[in-house]
Amino acid sequence: TNVKESVDITFGVDTEAETKNVDSCLKKLHLEQGKYNLWAIPMPWFPNEYDEKVHGNRYKKLLDNLSEIAYNQHLKENINVFLPFYYDMDMGLIKDMVEKLKLPYVICDNSKALTLGEKRALFRFSNCNICMRFHSVMFSIYNGQAGVFISYSDKTSNVIRMMGLEDYLVEYGIRNSADFYKEFDLDMQRVNQVMDNIFSDDKKSIEKITSKMKQEAAVAQEELIKWLK
C-alpha cells in the first residue's frame, strides 16, 4: 500500500488571511495589535450533561476564576475578545462571562463574518491568549504567541509538555468519567505563575518551536501534494 507517514500539517500551514491580509481581522473587529486579550473558552459540560444542582457551584467558581484572570494587571487594560469554537455550546459561557466582567469586550459571533484564517490570525496579534480548547492552544503556539493554556485532557497536556511549553500549562479536571478522570478546579496560584511567565519571557522559546513546526508542516505539505499526484 502507498502509505506516507507525516507530521500534522493542519495547524502549521498558514491560511491566505494569515499571509496576505493579516490585519483584516483587526479591522473587522476595530482592534489594535497588542491591545486585546483573546479568549477561547468552552462550556466544560455538554448541554445534555449539565445539571445546575450537580455542576452549578463549579461553573460559578470557574467564572470567578476566569474573571480573576481578566483583571490581572497584565490584562485588565485591554479589550476582551471572545472566540467561540462550538458556537451553540460556547456562547452561553461567553455571555455569562461578559455580564460578570463589566469590562470592554467583543464577541466574534456570526455577525462579524470572520473567515477561518482571520480567526487564526487573531491569536497572533493579541496581548495574551487564554486557551481552553486543544485547537486554540495549537493556533496560539503556531502563531508564536504564549498564553494561559488551560488543559482539561491528557492529550493537550502531553502535547504542551512535549513542546517544552509547560511554563504556560494549567490543568482543569472536568469530570471523573473522562479526560483526567477526576474533578478539580483551577489552581489560581499556578495561573498567576503562568501569567508571570508569559510577561517575563522574551518569547524566544515559543518562537523557536513555532518556526520549527512551520518548517516541518511546509515540508509535509509538499510531500502530500507529491503523494496526491
Say what each PLM segment does:
Residues 1-229:
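Active-site anion-handling motifs in enzyme catalytic cores
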